[in-house]
Amino acid sequence: PFLYLKEQGFDVDFVSVDSNGHIDLNQLISLIRDDTILVSIVYVNNEIGAIQNIESLVHSVKSINKNIVFHTDAVQAYGKLKIFPNKEGIDLLSVSGHKIHGPKGSGFLYIREKSKIKPQILGGGQQEGIRSGTENVPAIVGLKEAVLEYFTDHEKKIMKLYECKQRLIEQLLQIEGVVVHAISSDVQTAPHIVSVGFEGISR
């Protein structure tokens, strides 16, 4: 989407991450201009599982320009972490249903009350004019059921994920030539992602 915006004439900058997958905050701040309208950050790095401190990033961005819209891609975070969009100051948050065992193609967008959204699909004005077209009722119901199921005994499920992840990492580290990324004590990672490298094998 951002490359498409660039083709349409928008100025788009990409922020670097360090070896642990964390945003370079100094670079992010340096890229903010008077005419910056949007900052979009992935909540959880989908390759190594690093968790961004979204609340801190939002604060840093908004302290420079409170009118910047802050979006986070929470596809890998929703259901795996406790997310509080209002408390964290998030304006837009996107979620994909299949990551919590909902129907493929389903998802939702959290929109902060004062955020203005321009529809990309025009027509009948469904979904409060944000996305026209006949609603996919089975997918909507399936997503709802997936959310209800996923958040039943939620903390217990997350603890189980962390236990399985730790067990997997311990076993992997016993194999010669295997490297597990982002496992230092100062890196907070999601419970469901393990990044592994094998000596002698490139991408």
What are these model-derived regions, one by one?
Residues 1-203:
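Pyridoxal 5′-phosphate
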